[in-house]
């Protein structure tokens, strides 16, 4: 029987209290690369969440049968298989988004969040709790991605999901798009500001000297 309190903890904890990007500072590279548009940030969130959840589930199912000496290889094989499935589905049903995400879907296998949860949680916990932990961490990762993607697309081009929200001066509107938001360094600074804001609200997350 799944532990309801544990499921609630692993599902909701990563959203704010133990966010994989804001607190653990994991998965930052892809957060910089795929957040120029809200659409790609959302698709990447779904992809990482599915891979993390199902890899946790399958690894947890066979955790008692994996020799310690090859556990990392087994984990990577399971994660890589799921990444290939996600990549092929995107190419089949969302080809344009797949092209925009480029190699970053394939690089989910190297995402520290996916490997970290497999090793730290799935290898020690039952399947249902592990699955929910994967969903929680995927959503925690996604919250930051979506916020960054929202800000970058809105202020960088005046659009959301490719739809004009703030008409640019060139098209007779009032808004002057800020191209700096479309450059990778802007994502770095936005994530830094989000981390600062979160740790201001939750002082317990600040590391002691």
UniProtKB/Swiss-Prot annotation:
UniProt GO MF annotations: oxidoreductase activity, acting on NAD(P)H, quinone or similar compound as acceptor
InterPro entries xrefs: NqrD, NqrDE/RnfAE
Keywords linked to the UniProt accession: Cell inner membrane, Cell membrane, Ion transport, Membrane, NAD, Sodium, Sodium transport, Translocase, Transmembrane, Transmembrane helix, Transport, Ubiquinone
The keyword Repressor appears for this protein: no
Pfam families documented for this protein: Rnf-Nqr (PF02508)
Transmembrane parts of this sequence: 42-62, 66-86, 103-123, 131-151, 178-198
EC numbers for this chain: 7.2.1.1
Assigned GO CC terms: plasma membrane
Main localisation: membrane
GO biological process terms held by the UniProt record: sodium ion transport
Catalytic activity line of the entry: a ubiquinone + n Na(+)(in) + NADH + H(+) = a ubiquinol + n Na(+)(out) + NAD(+)
Bilayer topology annotation: Multi-pass membrane protein
Superkingdom of source: Bacteria
Localization per Swiss-Prot or TrEMBL: Cell inner membrane
Oligomeric form and interacting partners: Composed of six subunits; NqrA, NqrB, NqrC, NqrD, NqrE and NqrF.
NCBIfam families: nqrD, PRK09292.1, PRK12405.1
Function: NQR complex catalyzes the reduction of ubiquinone-1 to ubiquinol by two successive reactions, coupled with the transport of Na(+) ions from the cytoplasm to the periplasm. NqrA to NqrE are probably involved in the second step, the conversion of ubisemiquinone to ubiquinol.
Family the UniProt entry places it in: Belongs to the NqrDE/RnfAE family.
Protein known as: Na(+)-translocating NADH-quinone reductase subunit D
Gene transcribed to yield this protein: nqrD
């Amino acid at each position: 029987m799944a532990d309801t309190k544990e499921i609630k903890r692993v599902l909701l904890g990563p959203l704010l209290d133990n966010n994989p990007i804001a607190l653990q500072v994991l998965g930052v590279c892809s957060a910089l690369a795929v957040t120029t548009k809200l659409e790609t940030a959302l698709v990447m969130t779904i992809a990482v969440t599915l891979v993390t959840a199902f890899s946790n589930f399958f690894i947890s199912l066979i955790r008692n049968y994996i020799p310690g000496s090859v556990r990392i290889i087994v984990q990577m094989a399971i994660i890589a298989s799921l990444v290939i499935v996600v990549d092929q589905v995107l190419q089949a049903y969302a080809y344009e988004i797949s092209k925009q995400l480029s190699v970053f879907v394939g690089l989910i296998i190297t995402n520290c969040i996916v490997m970290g949860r497999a090793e730290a949680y799935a290898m020690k916990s039952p399947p249902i709790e592990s699955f929910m932990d994967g969903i929680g961490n995927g959503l925690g990762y996604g919250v930051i991605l979506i916020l960054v993607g929202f800000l970058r697309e809105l202020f960088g081009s005046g659009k959301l999901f490719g739809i004009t929200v703030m008409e640019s001066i060139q098209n007779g509107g009032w808004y002057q798009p800020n191209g700096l938001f479309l450059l990778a360094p802007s994502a770095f600074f936005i994530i830094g500001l989000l981390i600062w804001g979160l740790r201001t609200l939750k002082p317990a997350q600040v590391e002691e000297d």
